[in-house]
Curated annotation (Swiss-Prot):
Disulfide bonds: C41-C47, C633-C644
Chain positions found as Phosphoserine: S52
Glycosylation positions in this chain: N97
PTM: Contains sialylated polysaccharide chains.
EC number in record: 3.2.1.207
Pfam families in UniProt: Gal_mutarotas_2, Glyco_hydro_31_2nd, Glyco_hydro_31_3rd
UniProt keyword annotations, A-Z: Disulfide bond, Endoplasmic reticulum, Glycoprotein, Glycosidase, Golgi apparatus, Hydrolase, Phosphoprotein, Signal
Signal sequence annotation: 1-32
Catalytic activity entry: N(4)-(alpha-D-Glc-(1->3)-alpha-D-Man-(1->2)-alpha-D-Man-(1->2)-alpha-D-Man-(1->3)-[alpha-D-Man-(1->2)-alpha-D-Man-(1->3)-[alpha-D-Man-(1->2)-alpha-D-Man-(1->6)]-alpha-D-Man-(1->6)]-beta-D-Man-(1->4)-beta-D-GlcNAc-(1->4)-beta-D-GlcNAc)-L-asparaginyl-[protein] + H2O = N(4)-(alpha-D-Man-(1->2)-alpha-D-Man-(1->2)-alpha-D-Man-(1->3)-[alpha-D-Man-(1->2)-alpha-D-Man-(1->3)-[alpha-D-Man-(1->2)-alpha-D-Man-(1->6)]-alpha-D-Man-(1->6)]-beta-D-Man-(1->4)-beta-D-GlcNAc-(1->4)-beta-D-GlcNAc)-L-asparaginyl-[protein] (N-glucan mannose isomer 9A1,2,3B1,2,3) + beta-D-glucose; N(4)-(alpha-D-Glc-(1->3)-alpha-D-Glc-(1->3)-alpha-D-Man-(1->2)-alpha-D-Man-(1->2)-alpha-D-Man-(1->3)-[alpha-D-Man-(1->2)-alpha-D-Man-(1->3)-[alpha-D-Man-(1->2)-alpha-D-Man-(1->6)]-alpha-D-Man-(1->6)]-beta-D-Man-(1->4)-beta-D-GlcNAc-(1->4)-beta-D-GlcNAc)-L-asparaginyl-[protein] + H2O = N(4)-(alpha-D-Glc-(1->3)-alpha-D-Man-(1->2)-alpha-D-Man-(1->2)-alpha-D-Man-(1->3)-[alpha-D-Man-(1->2)-alpha-D-Man-(1->3)-[alpha-D-Man-(1->2)-alpha-D-Man-(1->6)]-alpha-D-Man-(1->6)]-beta-D-Man-(1->4)-beta-D-GlcNAc-(1->4)-beta-D-GlcNAc)-L-asparaginyl-[protein] + beta-D-glucose
Keyword match Ribonucleoprotein: no
Protein name per Swiss-Prot or TrEMBL: Neutral alpha-glucosidase AB
Amino acid sequence: MAAVAAVAARRRRSWTGLVLACLGVCLGLTLAVDRSNFKTCEESSFCKRQRSIRPGQSPYRALLDSLQLGPDTLTIHLINEVTKVLLVLELQGLQKNMTRIRIDELEPRRPRYRVPDVLVAEPPTARLSVSGQDDNSVEVTVAEGPYKIILTARPFRLDLLEDRSLLLSVNARGLLNFEHQRAPRVSQGSKDPAEGDGAQPEEAPGDGDKPEEIQGKAEKDEPGAWEETFKTHSDSKPYGPTSVGLDFSLPGMEHVYGIPEHADSLRLKVTEGGDPYRLYNLDVFQYELYNPMALYGSVPVLLAHSPHRDLGIFWLNAAETWVDISSNTAGKTLFGKMLDYLQGSGETPQTDVRWMSESGIIDVFLLLGPSVFDVFRQYASLTGTQALPPLFSLGYHQSRWNYRDEADVLEVNQGFDDHNLPCDFIWLDIEHADGKRYFTWDPSRFPQPRTMLEHLASKRRKLVAIVDPHIKVDSSYRVHEELQNLGLYVKTRDGSDYEGWCWPGAASYPDFTNPKMRAWWADMFRFENYEGSSSNLYVWNDMNEPSVFNGPEVTMLKDAQHYGGWEHRDLHNIYGFYVHMATADGLVLRSGGVERPFVLSRAFFAGSQRFGAVWTGDNTAEWDHLKISIPMCLSLGLVGVSFCGADVGGFFKNPEPELLVRWYQMGAYQPFFRAHAHLDTGRREPWLLPTQYQDMIRDALGQRYSLLPFWYTLFYQAHREGVPVMRALWVHYPQDVTTFSIDDEFLLGDALLVHPVTDSEAHGVQVYLPGQGEVWYDVHSYQKYHGPQTLYLPVTLSSIPVFQRGGTIVPRWMRVRRSSDCMKDDPITLFVALSPQGTAQGELFLDDGHTFNYQTGHEFLLRRFSFSGNTLVSSSADSKGHFETPVWIERVVIIGAGKPATVVLQTKGSPESRLSFQHDPETSVLILRKPGVNVASDWSIHLR
């Protein structure tokens, strides 16, 4: 039997090697991305066409006699005065200081794709009224906000004004370009490019009535309009060119952020002279840094910031999208004279943003702030907030491709206990499944998965197994057979099941845009369907861009067919969103709607925050990749996706011990904390390093677990309000220009400032501490620093600079145990960092840590702690919540305090009691021992 197992193992290794070899052929298995596998704008025909239109007089005119005004919607026709094609514009005022603009063809040959399921609901509207009109413009007032919209007819333009201040302008540069659908012109003797592909455009009513000179005028078929080839792949484009583009001008704005995912700086760069930023979910092998290439996820949201204003643009389109950014001055634009009139003469700095998408309609939300926190809440009201993760998912995750078998998993599990290291999860990659057949277990390596899971559960730990959305084509594989029989796969343009190449070899791809497919997928996670699973098994969705090794740009053909007759080109960027959604729904379903899910996804879109965590993909064990994870996660946080992390240690290559230690130190302060590694890397569990490095990693893990109450509270705030967990400095210091470009340090909430060490052999770092009149305390030494200032701080390998802002209160657990589940009832220590005014405040959220009872039964606590006038008060911050807990306050550490004569505790219904304390005059730290009060109770502590 042992010999048979050995032969089987060799075969599996050979198969994996074959797939890796194929992947190398497809992707260019080198030390960096093979750029030739991915399009530039010049190679993307619609981007090239859109970008060829230069700023100038727009050919579009609004037909004022077509204007119709409803209670909350203005509709008006736009005519392209060259082609005579009519569009229809819908303008809606929305509550919470937002505006929605939609532009579509008035009479399309076939309906255009409108992105479903991303918005949590149709947003509440605000009443519109016409407050002025002349022969070339209409002034519209929005009842819910202090702003007006001026619609100019010729050339078409929209200007949004607040009082006499111009906030932004739409089509000021004349770059609106809407490629209307048209009948393919077939030259004599040639074949219709759509002929015979099963997806011919239907005849549109009235086409025969259009004069030939109008139909053909200025509509030359440029290369790539009706068929496009990239490398060996052909895109049939049966409906012809359908791209859309529109420009937005932002006077007074020089700093823009967002539109992740890119391995680039936090502040977006001007793209003139290079490629635009690309949004097209792709499996990019060993991605390069500091360029605008597309990566695994796309969130089409851009934030603009100035010391006086914040705005957001949400471009709701799931097709391939490019975003051009240029710097300008308002005096050089078409609305410069208006700006002079409104704001006075003189040049105003300005950023221009141009969006270009391959298909769909123009559907854009303008988020008008005025503060960045207003923009966060506005966007969250549209797409939802970050899902509240289970507490245990905020702990440490140990992963690699791959843990060999059950014995290996249990040995790793024991290793954490033997070396006194906390851990919540162990992960299994693709080798755990039987021949890469997801929802199965390799019978020779994992013959008793439930027993293995039970052993992990006895240590209060969990397991994650990968479930990818490519299904092995195998008639004996139940998942494939059912999906094939039910007709739930993505189809080719001739109606057969689409088949590509991925980890299992030949694979088909479930059509997750179909609600029936998502329901089927969710049902697969029931314990009776996912054999060997249990309640402590959670899920990882990888390769869900989708990744197709032999497809164009390592993804699906754009003319593949989805539910409803839509092409893949229309919805590509939302495919991974649906995979994530269906998987999260499945984990909720298996518990009868009781348990919160944990699902990690590589691909994402606007709204993905509702379903779980994401990570920055297949990074490399290099210092620059350590660095780039900061702006990558900060960018995601700005657009609502807070649960972000990077593979600790780097996925590719082997990190030297110094780099691995520095990565653990940073990962401990990023929202999602997972170590992961490639199949060909050496094992790197912490105890395999020399003792001195083990100790440093143990300390980093200890910092993470100590702060879990703080992390959990931050995630509840993100869930409740839509604010990011990990924040760029400028978010809290919007008028401090120094912070606008900082992306090597960050804030956690408003309380902690973290400056990771991201250079080899560093002996010190430059740290910027913001805030006029604010103080910052080193969390290790309690040394006080005043802001704003830049400090050079010496560092050793054993620590990174972390500061607590004066004026905040941070809850901690001080006993680090095997896992977070072992700590959840431990007592709390409050770290009270006093402001120069002697004040501080903070919150603590507690519930059972894993169910929806906080929602369905209001079983939670949200406590507010405030310090003022030498008194610390605990009170309820949400009276709706009620939760019984044994958690009590064990200690209060007040930083920046003088020595009192006495310290008195007051609780309702009890006499005053004195507390013992200790004061260190050198650090001004006062420690109050064992107040002993339950965290759910109201109490106060007085320093006298």
